[in-house]
């Protein structure tokens, strides 16, 4: 931000304002993360059923909420009757968790850049990311590609740090 966030006098945005912006982005993340996890679990639980014959939707949702320990203050992000992602044939069937998993990969890969001696603008590391991960596309298993870039499996703690849930 210091490179371009300037007022009409050319003064750089104050660090205190940047800190407030960053803190605001992390507000309520515990709620939002729980809500996403609950929706992902509900999606998977629906797809574990062998048949939908005779299933009471409300009772099923209540049972899942109890099984996963969902507190009453946090409800499912979408009710099953209009949770189009999981039933609409959009390719997300039993895969709503993909949003969280993508965030894990995003935050973990970025953390590798942050830890680089050259910082996030490390051109050599960027080239490695491009060559070992991005350019390969679907030619190999995604985890194999990620590990070839990172040298390890993704660390989900990076997502939790990014959301301000852990230090």
What is each PLM-predicted segment?
Residues 1-167:
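Cation-handling catalytic/transport regions enriched in His/Asp/Glu
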């Amino acid at each position: 931000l210091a490179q371009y966030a300037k007022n009409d006098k050319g003064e750089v945005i104050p660090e205190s304002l940047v800190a407030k912006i960053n803190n605001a982005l992390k507000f309520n993340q515990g709620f939002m993360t729980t809500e996403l996890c609950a929706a992902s679990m509900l999606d998977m639980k629906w797809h574990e059923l062998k048949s939908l014959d005779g299933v009471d939707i409300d009772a099923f949702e209540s049972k899942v909420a109890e099984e996963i320990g969902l507190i009453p203050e946090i409800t499912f992000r979408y009710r099953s009757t209009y949770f189009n992602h999981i039933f609409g044939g959009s390719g997300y069937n039993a895969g709503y968790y993909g949003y969280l998993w993508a965030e894990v990969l995003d935050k973990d890969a970025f953390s590798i850049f942050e830890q680089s001696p050259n910082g996030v603008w490390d051109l050599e590391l960027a080239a490695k990311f491009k060559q070992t991960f991005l350019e390969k596309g679907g030619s190999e298993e995604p985890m194999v590609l990620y590990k070839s870039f990172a040298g390890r499996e993704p660390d989900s703690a990076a997502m939790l740090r990014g959301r301000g849930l852990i230090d």
